[in-house]
């Protein structure tokens, strides 16, 4: 998947590269698409919509196109969602640029935890690692730091590509 947004096109789009090599628009009309993450079975794409200050949920049909796209999580405050990751149980972890926080949501979108970044307000990305995959690494671009928080639940292990 590719995404594109900017001054030349304020409505943002996400493109997909099909197995036959053709590139087509997966979804358009998105106010600043940013972080993208697929659920474990790759049937749902979550999209951090920075300018809308929300996260969209896009179920993917068998033909590879989205269906019934809508707001999954509405955030508040300055900035908006940026990078994301998944917990092992299908919850969503969202870096909130402009608020200096990372939010951990249940698979149903309920807020479970808030991790505050003490070094700045521009938390931009997240990734799991460490023992039992419970360490959450957070990039904070205002200060240039990489922070680590130990969570009570593990992150989804990413498949290793060979």
What are these regions (language model features)?
Residues 3-5, 50, 60, 97, ...:
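Short loop/turn segments immediately following the C-termini of beta-strands
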Residues 16-20, 103-113, 121-122, 128-130, ...:
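Flexible "stalk/tail and boundary" regions
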Residues 8, 21-26, 45, 52-55, ...:
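Short, structured loop/turn "capping" segments at alpha-beta junctions
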């Amino acid at each position: 998947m590719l995404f594109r947004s900017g001054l030349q096109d304020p409505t943002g789009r996400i493109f997909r590269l099909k197995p036959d090599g053709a590139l087509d628009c997966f979804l358009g009309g998105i106010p600043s698409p940013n972080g993208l993450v697929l659920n474990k079975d790759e049937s749902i794409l979550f999209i951090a919509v920075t300018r809308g200050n929300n996260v969209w949920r896009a179920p993917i049909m068998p033909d590879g196109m989205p269906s019934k796209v809508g707001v999954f999580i509405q955030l508040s405050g300055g900035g908006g969602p940026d990078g994301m990751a998944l917990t092992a149980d299908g919850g969503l972890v969202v870096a909130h640029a402009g608020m200096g926080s990372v939010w951990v949501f249940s698979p149903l979108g309920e807020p479970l935890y808030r991790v505050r970044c003490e070094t700045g307000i521009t938390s931009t990305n997240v990734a799991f690692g460490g023992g039992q995959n419970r360490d959450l690494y957070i990039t904070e671009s205002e200060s240039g730091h990489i922070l680590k928080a130990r969570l009570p639940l593990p992150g989804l292990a990413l498949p290793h590509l060979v």
